[in-house]
């Protein structure tokens, strides 16, 4: 029996990348159907045949007015909803109709975002070694990861991970997972896709479930994709952001703060506690754990990518940390132009930040700053914290989409 010529330690060393995981390209996509927030209360109460609920409509109108959202994109059109009245009821059996939509449209929208990211990356699809796909919109086997692999013509040997039902924090989760994959597999190129469609959560209004109406006022559809890899070949690859560290935590005393339950009526959404208060109360601890090792204590000196769960979360975080308004500019822009797209939001914000930084003549992809933070907030109450480092902007870089 021949003896091995290498040790396990040597194999492990050869498997690992040298440098940190890096975002190499970003692509985003939305459905064609655009809904303006100013018109939405009238539309929503008309299509759900709830116009007789005048006081509730006024409450909903105030929710929309306070949302700081200008427009959203939704796959569900008025024509489709008219043909599927159970989806417009508050609690009618409708899961089959919802599933029929999302098992097709989630990978399709993900494909549109992925194609943009791959085009910007500029490398052959055959170099993609891993696929991480995330959605809170429906479930199927084989999953959206399999469907996307087939749609894009990726190699059959691509290593896939499908993440279902994670919720709004998962934009941070996918970056954390992609970081570990890229840094522990030399030469790996990870395609990360978050694709979210609100067809699973859309339902009519109810006086007894106002937190569901909060979701109806905030949620929008969108997909985002990034390519992540370590040790980029800078002759053909253009780094955008380095992923320096990543962590996840469950906030104390937050059980039941955000819940979602997949039932015959679709995905129901529950807000049971003061979510903005819980997040703002604990945000400094997350920042200290992430940035104290780096010697950073001034949180206005870093760029911010925060999941825009709603304007109250952003307002209270700003107040707690003493942030200047411009630190949340990219975050608030995405909230205004797209609404809350769950896991896809933070990737949209990264895209907005690198583009605007280049357009404004900033020195780095992070609004001219070197270090940054990406926060995901969602069910649990779970917080994902990713420390980012920007890269210098060269002429013409960071704008491509």
Swiss-Prot record:
Record field: transmembrane: none
Pfam families: Chal_sti_synt_C, Chal_sti_synt_N
Record carries keyword Thylakoid: no
Pathway(s): Secondary metabolite biosynthesis; flavonoid biosynthesis
EC code: 2.3.1.74
Biological role stated in the UniProt entry: The primary product of this enzyme is 4,2',4',6'-tetrahydroxychalcone (also termed naringenin-chalcone or chalcone) which can under specific conditions spontaneously isomerize into naringenin.
Protein name as it appears in the record: Chalcone synthase 4
Organism this protein belongs to: Sorghum bicolor (Sorghum)
Gene, per the UniProt record: CHS4
């Amino acid at each position: 029996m021949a003896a091995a010529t290498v040790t396990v330690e040597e194999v492990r060393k050869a498997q690992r990348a040298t440098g940190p995981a890096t975002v190499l390209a970003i692509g985003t996509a939305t459905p064609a159907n655009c809904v303006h927030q100013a018109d939405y209360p009238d539309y929503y109460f008309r299509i759900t045949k709830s116009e007789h609920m005048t006081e509730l409509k006024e409450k909903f109108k105030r929710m929309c007015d306070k949302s700081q959202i200008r427009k959203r994109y939704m796959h569900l059109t008025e024509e489709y909803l008219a043909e599927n009245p159970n989806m417009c009821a508050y609690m009618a059996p409708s899961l089959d109709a919802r599933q029929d939509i999302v098992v097709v449209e989630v990978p399709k929208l993900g494909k549109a975002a992925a194609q943009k990211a791959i085009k910007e990356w500029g490398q052959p699809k055959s170099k993609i070694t891993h696929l991480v796909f995330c959605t809170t919109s429906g479930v199927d086997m084989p999953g959206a990861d399999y469907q996307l692999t087939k749609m894009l013509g990726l190699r059959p040997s691509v290593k896939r991970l499908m993440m279902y039902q994670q919720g709004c924090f998962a934009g941070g989760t996918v970056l954390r997972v992609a970081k570990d994959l890229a840094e522990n597999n030399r030469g790996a190129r990870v395609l990360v896709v978050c694709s979210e469609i609100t067809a699973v959560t859309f339902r009519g209004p109810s006086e007894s479930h106002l937190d569901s109406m909060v979701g109806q006022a905030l949620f929008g559809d969108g997909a985002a994709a990034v390519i992540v890899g370590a040790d980029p070949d800078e002759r053909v690859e253009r780094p955008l952001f380095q992923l320096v560290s990543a962590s996840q935590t469950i906030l104390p005393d937050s059980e039941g703060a955000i819940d979602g339950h997949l039932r015959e009526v679709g995905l129901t959404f529950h807000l049971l506690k003061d979510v903005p208060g819980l997040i703002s109360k604990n945000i400094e601890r997350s920042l200290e754990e992430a940035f104290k090792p780096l010697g950073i204590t001034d949180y206005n000196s870093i760029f911010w990518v925060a999941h825009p769960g709603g304007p109250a979360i952003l307002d209270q975080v700003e107040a707690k940390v003493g942030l200047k308004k411009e630190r949340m500019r990219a975050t608030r822009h995405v909230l205004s132009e797209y609404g809350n797209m769950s896991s896809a939001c933070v990737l949209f914000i990264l895209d907005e930040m690198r583009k605007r930084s280049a357009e404004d003549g900033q020195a780095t992809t992070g609004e001219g700053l070197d270090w940054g933070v990406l926060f995901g907030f969602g069910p649990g109450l779970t917080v994902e914290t990713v420390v980012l480092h920007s890269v210098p902007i060269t002429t013409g870089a960071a704008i491509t989409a």
